[in-house]
């Protein structure tokens, strides 16, 4: 997801592991990484996680001491939860230290059926989910856990788990930075490469745990939503340059996101977006405030009050514009949710998602995001400079399901896929037939709309099953 330009302008101006027992992990004289990864963090964290979860271990975990030493930190699990979600599905949640800094922490999630307490059911399919801007794993893929107005159990992660998929996912470190933080110097270098590195670490840990518990060592299908899809594309680009055994991804689902474009309007929109961040970043402001929670709260509690975010609109109008307006540019049709418009083209109601559901979704947004991440992917899309994240797209050979929405980024996603080297690319652009792209099924409908399971998730599941390793 992107942050509407009107919001950005105002806010930026204001700112100017033992495996099968509890014995110590084995460190051999000549350590070797787990097959498929040379990441010492993965083996160390997998070893610790097996103790905490009591998952049955069938393949001993060997900690790669030499690789671990190169990380310059002692990786560890900071917190762990096991959360039953109903229907025999359980959510395992970890916060994992992956670096020496106080904020070098990722979230790792697993949503899966159980056959008994702490006994994950064996599955033939697995997927790893990467969220986009402004949201974390639960807010995007388990939205019912953050809303009293969503149907119980509603979310892509639970849908797939109920269909016998082993679902994993990540919280990027910026989602875990608490509100009220004042010193953001740690965010200075949190750009697209940092996202790539943390995503690959999360996937390596997931694969190490799957191997240790008898699920095999297959690489994973990766779904990247919105800017998470940017991270996904950049990860595929990165993995073309590492040995095959160290790659994590074997298939990719970019969910309503473009990576490259030949559309001048898209170039202008993302170049302008980058220009909003450049002055503040140069002045030492490395965080971008996320207005989701403020907009949702004011729309719920004071709908007719004057908006402090978009002057001239009420709080409710701001939330509606945020949902259904052309938030990128007037010549770009992208919007978040399908809606209804008045005679002037201004949104007056939501078409598929309810207003209380939308307010809940907004209020569950994270407070901050890293400016450099925005700037890096804006540069890739707008062809600014020579970023390294798109240099090897023609070498990407994995199968791809390009899953888009008619009212979101779907129409703009096709060009980028033509730059890939894969001969297995499927396109599915979802629409509901409103007759107007500006009121169509859109970017966030993909994960919130009641029609999403039928229109998007079931076709995704079919593709996933067709691409079993």
Predicted features by range, described:
Residues 12-54:
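Bacterial Sec-dependent N-terminal signal peptides
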Residues 68-122:
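N-terminal cap/lid segment of alpha/beta-hydrolase-fold proteins
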Residues 115-171:
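Short, surface-exposed "cap/lid" segments of acyl-processing enzymes
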Residues 187-211:
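Alpha/beta-hydrolase active-site loop
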Residues 212-226:
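Alpha/beta-hydrolase fold nucleophile elbow
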Residues 267-411:
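Alpha/beta-hydrolase
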Residues 403-441:
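Conserved loop-alpha-helix segment in the C-terminal half of the alpha/beta-hydrolase fold
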Residues 428-469:
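Catalytic active-site module of serine/aspartate enzymes centered on a nucleophile-bearing elbow/loop
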């Amino acid at each position: 997801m992107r942050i509407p330009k009107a919001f950005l302008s105002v806010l930026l101006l204001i700112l100017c592991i033992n495996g099968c027992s509890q014995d110590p992990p084995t460190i051999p004289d000549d350590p070797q990484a787990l097959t498929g990864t040379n990441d010492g963090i993965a083996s160390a964290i997998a070893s610790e996680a097996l103790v905490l979860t009591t998952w049955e271990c069938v393949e001993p975990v060997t900690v790669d001491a030499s690789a671990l030493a190169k990380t310059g930190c002692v990786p560890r699990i900071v917190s762990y939860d096991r959360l039953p979600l109903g229907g025999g599905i359980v959510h395992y949640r970890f916060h994992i230290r992956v670096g020496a800094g106080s904020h070098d922490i990722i979230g790792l999630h697993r949503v899966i059926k159980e056959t008994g307490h702490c006994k994950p059911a064996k599955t033939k399919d697995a997927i790893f989910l990467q969220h986009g801007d402004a949201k974390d794993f639960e807010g995007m893929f388990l939205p019912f856990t953050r809303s009293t107005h969503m149907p119980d159990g509603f979310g892509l992660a639970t849908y797939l788990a109920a269909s016998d998929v082993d679902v994993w996912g990540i919280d990027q470190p910026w989602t875990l930075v608490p509100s009220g933080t004042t010193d953001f110097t740690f965010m200075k270098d949190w750009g697209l490469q940092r996202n790539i590195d943390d995503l690959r670490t999360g996937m390596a840990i997931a694969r190490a745990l799957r191997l240790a518990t008898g699920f095999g060592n297959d690489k994973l299908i990766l779904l990247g939503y919105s800017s998470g899809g940017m991270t996904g594309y950049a990860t595929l680009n990165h993995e073309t340059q590492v040995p095959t055994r160290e790659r994590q991804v074997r298939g990719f689902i970019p969910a309503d996101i473009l990576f490259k474009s030949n559309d001048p309007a898209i170039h202008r929109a993302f170049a302008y977006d980058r220009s909003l961040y450049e002055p503040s970043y140069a002045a030492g402001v490395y965080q971008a405030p996320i207005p989701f929670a403020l907009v949702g709260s004011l729309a719920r509690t004071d709908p007719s009050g004057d908006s402090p975010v978009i002057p001239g609109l009420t709080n409710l109008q701001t939330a509606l514009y945020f949902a259904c307006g052309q938030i990128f540019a007037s010549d770009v049709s992208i919007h978040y949710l399908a809606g209804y418009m008045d005679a002037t083209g201004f949104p007056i109601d939501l078409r598929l998602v309810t207003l209380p559901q939308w307010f809940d979704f907004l209020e569950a947004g994270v407070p901050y995001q890293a400016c450099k991440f925005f700037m890096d992917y804006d540069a890739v899309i707008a062809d600014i400079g020579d970023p390294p994240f798109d240099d090897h797209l023609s070498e990407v050979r994995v199968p791809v399901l390009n899953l888009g929405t008619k009212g979101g980024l779907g129409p703009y996603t096709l060009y980028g896929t033509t730059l890939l080297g894969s001969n297995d690319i499927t396109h599915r652009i979802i629409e509901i037939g409103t007759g107007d792209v500006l009121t169509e099924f859109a970017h966030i409908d993909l994960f919130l709309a009641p029609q999403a399971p039928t229109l998007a998730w079931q076709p995704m599941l079919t593709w996933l099953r067709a691409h079993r390793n």
